[in-house]
């Protein structure tokens, strides 16, 4: 299990794509032996629900008979997109929290942080009947105050810079497969127009299944590994 903990010195690099910022945290990590007996992997998607992308992602999941976890932006859960949330949940996917407006969370007041979380939690519960169990901070921007305020498990993951249009589907596939190991969390995006990630997962999923991996939700990744999410911890793997 690899975990990132608040309190380490971090260097942050920021990329900008149009109006979309991404903040990548380079942090000290400590590695703990992975105790999972099976080769488990959790495929996770950020920045949905997106009509035109999330539905294609769900088609790929159905074709491959697997589940995933979706970290949703609350303000994107609308009358037009709510059916995607219900469809994902009905397929056995878990629906998690990715804030209301996708801000840098550490720059907010306590009240603003709680509104970002509660708004999205309520929108998800209205559709699925279940509250999120996990939170992924936008831009992986977090600190101890966020840990103290947000009573959810914190999730990061292994990505492939799939928010950058110049990173091809083939390169996204290669990067994810090179990082594969038991218990790892894949972090990709189902934002509007991200068709290259849709194409990438068409290759990633069968490749990992061919290596003996079982795709599970983020919740089952913990449960099947016999782990309980700890406070003050940001997980990249379990």
Language model segments and positions:
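Acidic-and-aromatic substrate-binding clefts and catalytic sites of carbohydrate-active enzymes
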Residues: 48-52, 72-80, 103-108, 136-142, ...
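Short low-complexity, flexible loop/linker segments enriched in glycine and/or proline
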Residues: 73, 84-86, 111-113, 170-171, ...
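N-terminal pre-catalytic segment of deacetylase/amide-hydrolase enzymes
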Residues: 1-44, 49-63, 79-85, 203-238
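Catalytic grooves of carbohydrate-active enzymes
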Residues: 180-219
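Alpha-helical scaffolding segments of alpha/beta enzyme cores, especially the outer helices
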Residues: 56-59, 83-90, 115, 119-122, ...
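CE4/NodB-like, metal-dependent polysaccharide N-deacetylase domain
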Residues: 58-67, 71, 94, 100, ...
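Short, well-structured secondary-structure segments
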Residues: 42-43, 58-78, 87-89, 93-98, ...
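His/Asp/Glu-enriched short active-site or ligand-binding loop at hydrolase and phosphoryl-transfer sites
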Residues: 131, 141-179, 213-225
């Amino acid at each position: 299990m690899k975990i990132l903990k608040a309190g380490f010195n971090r260097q942050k690099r920021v990329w900008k794509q149009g109006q979309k910022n991404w903040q990548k945290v380079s942090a000290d990590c400590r590695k703990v032996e992975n105790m999972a007996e099976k080769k488990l992997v959790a495929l996770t998607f950020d920045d949905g629900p997106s009509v035109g992308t999330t539905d294609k992602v769900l088609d790929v999941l159905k074709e491959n008979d697997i589940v995933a976890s979706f970290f949703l932006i609350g303000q994107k859960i609308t009358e037009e997109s709510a059916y995607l949330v219900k469809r994902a949940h009905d397929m056995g996917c878990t629906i998690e929290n990715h804030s209301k407006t996708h801000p840098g969370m550490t720059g907010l007041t306590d009240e603003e942080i709680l509104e970002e979380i509660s708004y999205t939690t309520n929108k998800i519960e209205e559709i699925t009947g279940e509250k999120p169990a996990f939170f992924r901070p936008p831009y992986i921007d977090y600190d101890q105050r966020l840990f103290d305020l947000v009573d959810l498990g914190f999730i990061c993951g292994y990505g492939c810079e799939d928010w950058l249009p110049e990173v091809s589907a083939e390169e996204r596939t290669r990067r994810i497969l090179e990082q594969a190991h038991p218990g790892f969390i894949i972090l990709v995006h189902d934002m509007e127009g991200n068709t290259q990630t849709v194409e990438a997962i068409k290759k990633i999923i069968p490749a990992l299944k061919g290596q003996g991996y079982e795709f599970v939700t983020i919740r089952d990744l913990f449960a099947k590994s016999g782990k309980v999410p700890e406070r003050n911890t940001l997980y990249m793997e379990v």
